[in-house]
């Protein structure tokens, strides 16, 4: 039979209210001896709180919803893992939703999470989600007093809680590295044109180019962050005869490298390549890709901190946190000045 608070109270010879307060961290007014006795009994009797009953009293379910655009993308899989880890440390449950980069599915999942009375929702937007759709979803969430935070993929709004990487700096660092190695004829394989993070990476890359008078105008190819697109675009990119390629994410770089090797080209002897994300599986061993490191663990932690702040400060101004990336120099780039 499942142990209840009543069972613990009987054995501790105290009231149910006392047991409840101690187990919820509010028993400071009771003696340390009694507190220890109650906690020990709860552990020995394998007591598990009734979360439904707790939520009815506290109006909290201790549940967070996470809506991601594509969990098959390893970057988002790693992000989900880090957020789950943070939730576990905070004793929060996590509900994971995969929108498949579909704004309608994204909205449906948000509606479902609202219906499940989650305490907060973290969203990495689908590629084609508009400002209007995002604000509509935020309003529905706000009406139910649910915390809402955008992560990674953003929209240019000062009304939304959001946590992101400084993608303009990331684009700048990647390009600056290639320029410092003596490369002057560059190609960029970008992300989807509609995504703000791809636009910011391009802006940063172009800023670095503008600081180098001897640099040629870069060749810009539109990608979609998939390895398939990187593979598909490789021949077209090579025809422009760059000495180096900046792929706007690691998956695109991975697809590029596979095709380039099939074409008999060597990395970095024939072409230098820089990626973006620093996905562990793609950046060790044979590949050893120079890339922009996104601190996913910090991104996840800040997103949860933002939700926790919003739980207690519903009417405060929007929280917007920007985390700086860094470059990881490995073996996929060559110095042309040696």
What is the meaning of each model-derived region?
Residues 45, 90, 144-145, 212, ...:
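Helix C-cap/helix->beta junction micro-motif
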Residues 4, 233-338:
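Flexible loop/turn connectors
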Residues 1-61:
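N-terminal helix-turn-helix DNA-binding module of bacterial transcription factors
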Residues 59-176, 180, 235-240:
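Alpha-helical recognition/docking segments in bacterial nutrient-uptake
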Residues 69-78, 97-105, 127-131, 153, ...:
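Hinge/beta->alpha junction and helix N-cap segments in small-molecule ligand-binding domains
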Residues 184-185, 216-218, 266-272:
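Short acidic capping loops at alpha-helix termini that bridge into adjacent secondary structure
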């Amino acid at each position: 039979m499942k142990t209840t608070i009543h069972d613990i109270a009987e054995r501790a010879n105290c009231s149910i209210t006392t047991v409840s307060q101690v187990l919820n961290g509010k028993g400071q007014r009771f003696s340390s001896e009694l507190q220890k006795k109650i906690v020990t009994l709860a552990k020995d009797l394998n007591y598990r709180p009734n979360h439904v009953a707790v939520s009815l009293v506290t109006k909290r379910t201790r549940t967070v919803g996470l809506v991601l655009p594509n969990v098959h993308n390893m970057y988002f899989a790693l992000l989900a893992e880090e957020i789950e880890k943070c939730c576990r440390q905070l004793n929060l449950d996590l509900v994971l939703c995969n929108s498949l980069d579909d704004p309608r599915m994204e909205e449906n999942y948000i509606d479902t999470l609202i219906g499940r009375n989650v305490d907060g929702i973290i969203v990495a937007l689908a590629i084609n989600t508009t400002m209007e759709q995002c604000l509509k979803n935020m309003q529905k969430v706000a009406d139910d007093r649910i915390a809402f935070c955008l992560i990674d993929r953003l929209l240019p709004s000062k009304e939304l809680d959001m946590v992101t990487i400084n993608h303009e700096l990331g684009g700048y660092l990647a390009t600056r590295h290639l320029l410092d190695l003596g490369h002057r004829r560059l190609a960029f394989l970008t992300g989807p044109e509609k995504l703000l993070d791809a636009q910011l990476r391009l802006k940063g890359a172009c800023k670095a180019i503008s600081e180098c008078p001897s640099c040629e105008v870069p060749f810009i190819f539109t990608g979609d962050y998939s390895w398939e697109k990187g593979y598909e675009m490789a021949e077209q990119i090579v025809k422009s005869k760059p000495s180096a390629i900046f792929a706007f994410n690691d998956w695109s770089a991975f697809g590029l490298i596979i095709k380039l090797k099939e074409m008999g080209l060597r990395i970095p002897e024939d072409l230098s390549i820089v990626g973006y994300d620093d996905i562990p599986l793609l950046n060790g061993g044979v590949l050893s890709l120079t890339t922009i490191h996104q601190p996913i663990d910090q991104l996840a932690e800040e997103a949860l901190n933002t939700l926790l702040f919003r739980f207690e400060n519903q009417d405060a101004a929007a929280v917007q946190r920007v985390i700086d990336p860094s470059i990881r120099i490995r073996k996929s780039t060559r110095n042309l000045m040696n």
